[in-house]
Amino acid sequence: MSDSCPVAHEGNTQSTSESENPVIPSPTPAANRPRNNRDWWPNQPELSVLHAHTSKSNPMGEDFDYAEEFAKLDVEALKRDVIDLMTTSQDWWPADYGHYGGLFIRMSWHAAGTYRIADGRGGGGQGAQRFAPLNSWPDNANLDKARRLLWPVKQKYGKQISWADLLVFAGNCALESMGFKTFGFGFGREDIWEPEEMYWGPEDTWLGDERYSGDRELSGPLGAVQMGLIYVNPEGPNGQPDPLAAARDIRETFSRMAMNDVETAALIAGGHTFGKTHGAGDADLVGPEPEGAPIEQQGLGWKSAYGTGVGKDAITSGLEVVWTPTPTKWDNSFLEVLYGYEWELTKSPAGAWQWTAKDGAGAGTIPDPFDSSAGRAPTMLTTDLSLRIDPAYEKITRRWLDHPEEFAEEFAKAWYKLLHRDMGPVTRYLGPWVPEAQLWQDPVPAVDHQLIGDSEIAALKGKILDSGLSIPQLVSTAWASAATHRSTDMRGGANGARIRLAPQKDWEINSPAELSTILQTLEQIQQDFNSSQSGGVKVSLADVIVLAGAAAVEKAAKNAGHDVTVPFTPGRTDATQEQTDVESFAVLEPKADGFRNYLRAGEKLPAEALLVDRAYMLNLTAPEMTVLVGGLRALNANFGQTKHGVFTDRPEALTNDFFVNLLDMGTEWKGASSAENVYEGTDRVTGAAKWTATAVDLVFGSNSQLRALAEVYAADDAQQKFVQDFVSAWNKVMNLDRFDLD
C-alpha cells in the first residue's frame, strides 16, 4: 500500500448538504402563540429550573426506590432477552444483516454521548433521549425505532429496569452478542419524566453553527459542532469533506466530553466495526421528526416515502456506508479496510459526501444487508479517514492495525467510560458487573477505621472552636469543599478532601494562601485526635472540614440567640493526589459562586444567572438558595471578606438581617461609580452611605419571585424559621456527595 495521501482530491467538493442528515427540515416555532413571562421579561433569572423533575411529573411516587426494585431483577434473564431481541427482525423495521446490534450501539452511544465535561450536563444517566429535543435531533434519526424495539423488554420488566439503564445496556449487550468482551457495566440510572431544559446552543435551526467564532473557536460549554448533532458532521466541517479539518473538530468535541486521542480513536474505530449508515435514496422523501410527526404516527418520526421506507430503502443520515466485510462481528476489519485501500470522494444515493475505495478496488467484498448474493465496494466516512490522515490519530490506529488486542482493550475501556461518565462514583452503580473504580470516576478510599461517635464529635467541635480560626474561615472552607458538587454528573463535593489537593487548593476562589493556613490548623487537630484514640477510632480530614463548618454555624446561631445542632454524619475519607486527575478536576473550578459573592473577572453572563446555575448544580430549590445566600452573608463568608451584601451590624451571628435590611425602603440603591458590578445603598433621606451590594444580593429584592421569598425571611416572626431552614439547606449541601447514605 502506498504511503502517500490515501485520498484523491480531484473534482468539485462543493457540499450539497449541511449535515449528516441533509434533508431533515428544522421545526417551525409557533409564530402566533400566547406570550409567557419569559417572552416579556427575558432578562429575569430563570428560576423554574430549580423546580423541575418534581414528584408532580413523576408517576412512580415519592416513595419509589429504584435500587430496591432493581435488586429484584434477574439481570442475566434481562441480558438474554435483550440479546435475543437483536436477531429477531421485525417487518416494520427490518434488521440490517438480520442483527440490530449496530442500531443499538448507535442508540446507546447517542444516549450517553451528549455528555459535556464543562458543566456535566447531558449523558445517558436520566433516559433523556426519550424526550424532546433529543428524540428529534437530526443525529438521532430513526433511533425512535430502536426504542420501540426495546419496548417489549421494558414492558416485561417494568419498574425493575429504568429506561435510562436499558437504553445504554442495550448497546453493551449488542457488543457482547457480536463477540466483543466489554469492560463491565453498572446499572443505577433513574428516569426523568419531562424534558431537561438546558442550553444546547444559540442556533434556531437544525444544524446551524453560530456557536463558532474566530478561527473555528467553539463556544463553551457546548460539545457538538452543530445544533442537533451529537459530536461532529461525518461529512466534514459544515459538509466539506476534508478529513484533516474533520480531525480538528473530532479532537475538540471528544475532548469536551472527557475523551483523549486514544479513547476517541478507539470509540470511532470500535463503533464503526459494526453495522452501517443509511442513505438509500432521495432524502427529500423523509418526513418530520417524532415531535413534529402527525398524531397517528404515535411518536414515530422520519417516515419515508422512498420505496418501502425501511430495510434496503431506509434513509437515516443520507450516507450509505458499510465499513467492514463482517458488520455483525467484532474483529480488526475496520482498520484493515481503512488502511487497505486508497480512497476517492463519492456521493451517496441521497447526495451526501462519502469515500469509496479508489479505482474499483475491493468491489464485491462488502456484503449487502438484505441480499446475500450481492456485494458492495468498501466505503468510509470523512471522519473515518481522519483516523488515518491526522498524524496523532494515525500513529495510534496504525499500531492497533498490528496489535488488535490493544485496540480491543482500549475500546472496551473507552466504551465503558462513555456509558458511565455522568454517573459519578462507583458507589452509585448497581449490578454484578461493576469493575474496580477508574481514575475518571474520582475514587476515594474505603473507610478502614471505626467512625467517631457523639462524644468524639463534641470534643472535636470544641477543639475546632478553640483553634483561633474564625467563623468565616470555618464556614468558607466547609462550603468551598462541599460546593464543588455538580448534580449534573455527580462529581465534586466534600468527600475526599480534595480541597487540599491540586488543582482545588490553588483556585482563586479558595484564597490559596489563607486556605493553606486553615487546612494546616485543621490537619493538626485531626492528627492530634487520631493519635490520642484507641480502639481503631479515627477521623478523616474531609470529616473534620465539614464538622468545622457545622461547629461554626452552631456558634453563629448561638450568637444570634438560638441553640441548634447541625446534623453531621461521619464516613468521608481522604483521597490522594494520585487518585485525582488534575486536568479533569480543573473543569469544576467555579467561574462564579454567588453564595460567596464571587465572580471571576471577564465573565459575560449576569452574576444572578450564574447564581441560579450554581444552585441548580447543588440541587437546591429557590427557597433553599435564598436562605443560604442570606445566611452566608450574615456569617460574613464572602470571597475576600468583601462587605458586599453583608447587611448587618452584627456579622458572624446567624440572623435574618440580610433580608430585613435589603427590603428596607429607607435605602436607595445606585450603581457604584468606583467599581464594576457593585451597587451602593444610601439613606434615602440623608444620603449617608449604608451598604454595598452586587447584583446577586439585589436580585432578592428586584425579582418578584425572589422578593416574595425574601419577605418570608424578613418578617418579625421569621428568625427561628430562618435558622432552621438555613441549617437544613446547609446540611443538604454538605452531604450532596454522600451517596453511601442514600
Curated annotation (Swiss-Prot):
Active site: 110 (proton acceptor)
Cross-link (Tryptophyl-tyrosyl-methioninium (Trp-Tyr) (with M-257)) at residue(s): 109-231
The organism's place on the tree of life at top rank: Bacteria
Chain intervals for the UniProt region annotation (Disordered): 1-43
Any Gene Ontology CC annotation: cytosol
CDD domains registered for this protein in UniProt: catalase_peroxidase_1, catalase_peroxidase_2
Site annotation Transition state stabilizer: residues: 106
EC top class, as a word: oxidoreductase
Cofactor note (record): Binds 1 heme b (iron(II)-protoporphyrin IX) group per dimer.
Family stated for the protein in its record: Belongs to the peroxidase family. Peroxidase/catalase subfamily.
Listed name of the protein: Catalase-peroxidase
Organism, scientific name: Rhodococcus jostii (strain RHA1)
Lineage: Bacteria, Bacillati, Actinomycetota, Actinomycetes, Mycobacteriales
Recorded name of the encoding gene: katG
